[in-house]
UniProtKB/Swiss-Prot annotation:
Full protein name: Serine hydroxymethyltransferase
Residues annotated with N6-(pyridoxal phosphate)lysine modification: 227
InterPro entries, per database record: PyrdxlP-dep_Trfase, PyrdxlP-dep_Trfase_major, PyrdxlP-dep_Trfase_small, Ser_HO-MeTrfase, Ser_HO-MeTrfase-like, Ser_HO-MeTrfase_PLP_BS, SHMT-like_dom
Organism expressing this protein natively: Saccharolobus islandicus (strain Y.G.57.14 / Yellowstone #1)
UniProt subunit comment: Homodimer.
Record's function text: Catalyzes the reversible interconversion of serine and glycine with a modified folate serving as the one-carbon carrier. Also exhibits a pteridine-independent aldolase activity toward beta-hydroxyamino acids, producing glycine and aldehydes, via a retro-aldol mechanism.
Keyword field: Amino-acid biosynthesis, Cytoplasm, One-carbon metabolism, Pyridoxal phosphate, Transferase
Length: 433
C-alpha cells in the first residue's frame, strides 16, 4: 500500500531538513545546537504521550511514577553541574522561565531595570515582549559604549533613584559578561531582586569559562536548555536557596505551563551527564573557536565588534556588514551558500531597524560540537570573505561548504559507544539508536 501524497510530502520535507541542516550547512545560529545521538535516542519515548501536572510526587494525574523519577534525577543532575540548590525544569522555554519570574517579582505598573538593548537585552526583557505583556515598566540601564556593556557607575545611581522591583542582566547578543557582582549589593540595598537570564551562556557557566551569576549575587537564574547547553529545546530556573525560587516554583503550574513536555526530561538528563564529563573541554573549545573566528574575520577586512576588548568572551561573534548592504541582505546571501547566521541589531542600531539591522550574530557552539576547532574557524572566515567581499560564485562556495561538512558529521563531547543502549530500547517504539 502506497502512502497518501500528503504523507509523502511530510516525510519528504522532514528528510530534506535533516539532510540539509545536519549534513550540508555550517550552522552558526547563536541560539541553536544539536543533541547527541544518545540524547536523541531517549527524546522519543512514551513520555512524549503523557501528562504530569504539578511537581514530582505531587501530581494531579496517575501513572507518573517514572516521570517523577526522571524529573527528580534530571533536576539533581542539573543542580550538580550548575552548583546550585534549586532547579525547576517545567518551563518549556527560556522566555516562559522569564515570564514566571517576572510575574512573581512585580505587579502591573511596577518598574524593572534591564540591561540596555545595545548591550544585548532579550526581547522578553522589553516592552515589546514579556515585560510589556505583563504590564511591567522596563527602564534600560545606561550603556557603556566603549565596553559594550552596562555602565556600572550610572547603573548604580539609577538603581538607587528608581528603586525597581527587580533588575535583569543577561542577553541575546552577549559578547561579554554583565557586571553581576558589581551591581548585586546595590540591587539588594533597595530591596530589589537580581534576575540573570543565562539562556545563551548556560553551557559556558557549566563549563567554567563564564562566571556563575548565582555565586556573584543573582537571586535567580533562568536558562534555555538548547543553546550552549546542547540539550532539547526547553527552559529551566535555578537558585541557591532563595525564597524567590519557592514563590516562582509554586506558580509555574498553573499560571504558565500545564503539562511540561515530559519527553524533554530524559534528554535533558543525558545532556547534563554529558556536560558533567565533557562540559569543560567543550566550553573551552567554544570560546577558543569564537575568538579565532573573530580574529580571522577581522584579518580579512570585516568590522568585528569589540576589537578593543578581544572581540568576545562567549560563543558569539558580532560583525558590522553595513558597508556590504546590511544584515538582512548578507544573512540571506550567506544562506544561499549554506552558511546559516542571523541578522542582528548592533549596539548603535535603533530598535526600529530590527528588520534590516547593521550586523550579523554568529555562534560557534554547534559546529564546535561537530568537532570543529581553530583551523576550521579560519576556513569559515575565508568562506565569508569569498561570499561577501570577493563575490565569488555562490554555487561554488556552496559546494565548498558541503565538502567541508563531510568531515564534520559526528557529534563530539558525548559517549561514543551506542551498542549498550540496545537493551534499553523499546521494540514497540523502535527507537533509533
Amino acid at each position: 500500500m502506497s502512502f497518501p501524497k500528503e504523507l509523502e510530502k511530510v516525510l519528504e520535507i522532514t528528510k530534506a531538513q535533516n539532510v540539509w541542516r545536519r549534513t550540508q550547512t555550517l550552522n552558526l545560529i547563536a541560539s541553536e545546537n544539536v543533541m547527541s545521538p544518545l540524547a536523541e535516542s531517549v527524546y522519543m519515548s512514551d513520555f512524549m504521550s503523557r501528562y504530569a501536572e504539578g511537581k514530582p510526587y505531587k501530581r494531579y494525574y496517575q501513572g507518573t511514577k517514572y516521570t517523577d523519577e526522571i524529573e527528580t534525577l534530571a533536576m539533581d543532575l542539573m543542580n550538580e553541574i550548575t552548583n546550585s540548590k534549586d532547579c525547576d525544569l517545567r518551563p518549556t522555554s527560556g522566555t516562559i522561565a522569564n515570564a514566571a519570574v517576572f510575574r512573581v517579582l512585580a505587579e502591573p505598573g511596577d518598574k524593572a531595570l534591564i540591561a540596555p538593548v545595545q548591550a544585548g537585552a532579550h526581547v522578553s526583557h522589553t516592552k515589546f515582549g514579556t515585560l510589556g505583556a505583563l504590564g511591567i515598566q522596563h527602564i534600560e540601564m545606561p550603556f557603556d559604549e566603549e565596553n559594550i556593556n552596562v555602565d556600572v557607575d550610572k547603573a548604580i545611581k539609577m538603581i538607587e533613584e528608581v528603586k525597581p522591583k527587580f533588575v535583569v542582566l543577561g542577553g541575546s547578543l552577549y559578547l561579554f559578561p554583565h557586571p553581576t557582582k558589581e551591581l548585586a549589593p546595590h540591587v539588594h540595598a533597595v530591596g530589589a531582586k537580581l534576575v540573570y537570564d543565562a539562556a545563551h551562556v548556560y553551557g559556558l557557566i557549566e563549563g567554567k569559562v563564564w562566571s556563575s551569576p548565582l555565586k556573584e549575587g543573582a537571586d535567580i537564574m533562568t536558562v534555555s536548555t538548547h543553546k550552549t547547553f546542547p540539550g532539547p529545546q526547553g527552559g529551566a530556573i535555578f537558585s541557591d536557596g532563595s525564597e524567590v525560587f519557592k514563590q516562582v516554583s509554586r506558580t509555574i503550574f498553573p499560571w504558565f505551563v500545564s503539562n511540561h513536555h515530559l519527553h524533554r526530561l530524559p534528554a535533558t538528563a543525558v545532556t547534563a551527564i554529558e556536560m558533567k564529563y565533557f562540559g569543560e573541554s567543550y566550553a573551552n573549545q567554544i570560546t577558543r573557536n569564537s575568538k579565532a573566528l573573530a580574529e580571522a574575520l577581522a584579518e580579512r577586512g570585516f568590522k568585528v565588534i569589540g576589537e578593543n576588548l578581544g572581540y568576545t568572551k562567549s560563543h558569539q561573534v558580532a560583525v558590522d556588514v553595513r558597508q556590504f548592504g546590511g544584515g538582512n541582505k548578507i544573512a540571506k546571501l550567506l544562506e544561499d551558500a549554506n552558511i546559516i547566521v542571523n541578522k542582528n541589531l548592533l549596539p548603535y542600531d535603533k530598535p526600529e531597524n530590527v528588520s534590516d539591522p547593521s550586523g550579523l550574530r554568529i555562534g560557534v557552539q554547534e559546529m564546535t560540537r561537530y568537532g570543529m576547532k581553530e583551523s576550521e574557524m579560519e576556513e569559515i572566515a575565508e568562506l565569508f570573505k569569498k561570499v561577501i567581499i570577493d563575490k565569488k560564485d555562490i554555487n561554488e562556495v556552496k559546494k565548498e561548504v558541503i565538502d567541508m561538512r563531510k568531515n564534520f558529521l559526528e557529534v563530539k563531547y558525548t559517549f561514543d559507544d551506542m551498542k549498550d543502549l540496545e537493551k534499553y530500547s523499546s521494540k514497540s517504539l523502535k527507537l533509533i539508536i
